[in-house]
């Protein structure tokens, strides 16, 4: 239960950080491993290069369920299915809508893998994979 509580907070933090209009990963950096950070950062650079920015309103998380957990050596991986509702759109530099709808609630389905080293004194988990 404690893990899922933290996973829900991490999910909302990462989604809103990735989708805010500054095109930078800031508040969720410590929640991402290097590979995921680089993937997200590259996507944001490409969006920024096109002159686009995102607007998101996180409505809420409908569900978060542990789908699988696997221990490999000292590393524990937990796969979580999320269903959330957001309002999102991408705008260009002239504020014209490129995609999405700023007035429509959209349901999103994500499967994420969180990981932590069980021998580490750091209790925090990191996002290591997105499967959707």
Name every feature range the model reports, one short phrase each.
Residues 1-59:
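Core segments of small alpha/beta cavity-forming domains
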Residues 2-5, 71, 101:
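Short, solvent-exposed beta-strand/turn "edge" segments of beta-rich domains on protein surfaces
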Residues 38-47, 70-76, 111:
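Short, charged low-complexity intrinsically disordered segments located at boundaries
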Residues 42-49, 59-64, 93-97, 108-110:
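Short amphipathic alpha-helical surface micro-motifs
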Residues 52-92:
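Surface-exposed, charged secondary-structure patches
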Residues 79-132:
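Compact beta-sheet-dominated globular domain cores
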